[in-house]
Amino acid sequence: MADIQNISLDSPGSVGAVAVPVVFALIFLLGMVGNGLVLAVLLQPGPSAWQEPGSTTDLFILNLAVADLCFILCCVPFQAAIYTLDAWLFGAFVCKTVHLLIYLTMYASSFTLAAVSVDRYLAVRHPLRSRALRTPRNARAAVGLVWLLAALFSAPYLSYYGTVRYGALELCVPAWEDARRRALDVATFAAGYLLPVTVVSLAYGRTLCFLWAAVGPAGAAAAEARRRATGRAGRAMLTVAALYALCWGPHHALILCFWYGRFAFSPATYACRLASHCLAYANSCLNPLVYSLASRHFRARFRRLWPCGHRRHRHHHHRLHRALRRVQPASSGPAGYPGDARPRGWSMEPRGDALRGGETRLTLSARGPQ
């Protein structure tokens, strides 16, 4: 693993020497901008970005954005340096810290996705009984537990990596012997990938089975549950979970193949290793795109971040308000009669000032229920 992870690119003019910095730079820029905007949108005062009263989804999405932002800021530049430079230039402490943060944020993301899937299952399967459990306070406690577990599971990586001298070069490589490395890599696959993906699959699978099996007198409730489960937040988080499984799957598969299969060191296997890293790291910049495509309310809150968009929204609101004030009711009957199309509480009242010809100007005025 150390050998293939620290093979330098063949030559400065090779395709890899050009592609690797470009790909990692794109991941860094898109991830920083995208997740930064997600934080700015979710930290705005106001209702949930998903229009769900008392929603805990925003807190989990906020936690995912924080984990992705930490990963991109603290890990991607140094991993790019591993693949583009012949030596490690940042010292032993940074070598250990970078790899600790890689797995810390990976665990935080996977555990958060598992928590979201359970939250969505409870919202659909037990909408009333789970209301007292699915509160912002409990969501914050769940986020704290996620980071605590992530820290515990990733702590061994603080000593897993270290720096060694290879001739005149210093390299950042795994420092453990093979048996311990294999045990930790398998444990990371089981706890950081297999377990969360299994929880997500079971939670969303049971949710869909419940929705499709609901028949009889509970049909109306099932229809409402189906609408909520397939709503914007549910679809977005299911997409995010699927992307996580697809992006991190090849990374773990190659590690297992290295330990238990035939993994000869060659340019082809090196390219596979590099591609799996790029795919796993790209996962951190895909989530903001999913949120923006899934929720028009999220997009509306994003537009309010910019003064021009906010002014446009206010101008449109004022124009609509003026148009509504000029609307004359189509009905000639008294307010509130069965054929009246006017909203309840609105009536036509004469103003005191008369127009020419003895006509009285009529305006809409808001009155409470009589």
Curated annotation (Swiss-Prot):
PANTHER family: GALANIN RECEPTOR 3, LEUCOKININ RECEPTOR-RELATED. It is found in: Cell membrane. Residues 42-57, 119-138, 206-236, 281-370 are cytoplasmic. Residues 350-359 have a biased composition (Basic and acidic residues). One of its GO terms (molecular function) is peptide hormone binding. One of its GO terms (biological process) is positive regulation of transcription by RNA polymerase II. Receptor for the hormone galanin and spexin-1. Pfam families: 7tm_1. Residues 1-20, 79-96, 160-184, 258-259 are extracellular. A lipid is attached at residue 308 (S-palmitoyl cysteine). This is Galanin receptor type 3. InterPro entries: Galanin_rcpt (IPR000405), Galnin_3_rcpt (IPR003908), GPCR_Rhodpsn (IPR000276), GPCR_Rhodpsn_7TM (IPR017452). Residues 328-370 are annotated as: Disordered.
